[in-house]
Amino acid sequence: DTIKKQLLKSPEFRDIVSHTTRAPRTNNGCAEQDGIDYHFIDSQTAENMLQNNEFIEAKFVHGTVYGTSVAELKLAHDQNRVAITDIDVQGVEEYERLAPDSIAIFIVPPNSQTWIERLKKRYATEEDFQAEWPKRHASAIKELAYALEVPYYHVIINDDLERAIRVTEEIILRGDVFKRQDDEARLVARNLLNDIINL
């Protein structure tokens, strides 16, 4: 989220705010806001949107619906801005199927300890974190393994925030130049995956 928020300070980019049926959370001490962090909707609204084909992609993740609406992408297009979003690998797979020229970036921490520290900040209490840990752990393994296997992800190690922001922006604006130029990052990510598996 930090990298995306920095990119969104530029008028070139527009955030594609996803819809979700989960309740707002507190991340790093700040409550999520409707229309900014997500469009928080109930299950019936999600079902209606699905039936009316109002989502570009929608998936069930951890028992919750997450989706990107056609309306959100249309806003970016109408404003002639680069659409950016933060979605899971299932959503990216759908984007790649619908628009193969989409640019997919997988940002990972430098090690498992940093990953756990950052993940804990997403929860209000240690108890909340521990309750979600089994799902998050399994999901991290699945998603990172998948991202390392498919050819369309650019992998970035977020060990230096300013560098990670700069590289992310360069890839978004000049993606073809960077195709498969991330072997070192992929090696770090592969080691991270092995560490996470062994937690």
Description of each model-found segment:
Residues 127-174, 178-199:
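Small-molecule kinase domains that catalyze NTP-dependent phosphoryl transfer to phosphate-bearing small molecules
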Residues 20-83:
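ATP-dependent small-molecule kinase phosphotransfer cores
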Residues 1-5:
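Glycine-rich phosphate-binding P-loop
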Residues 83-88, 97-121, 157-158:
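Conserved phosphate-donor/acceptor-positioning beta-strand/loop module used by diverse small-molecule
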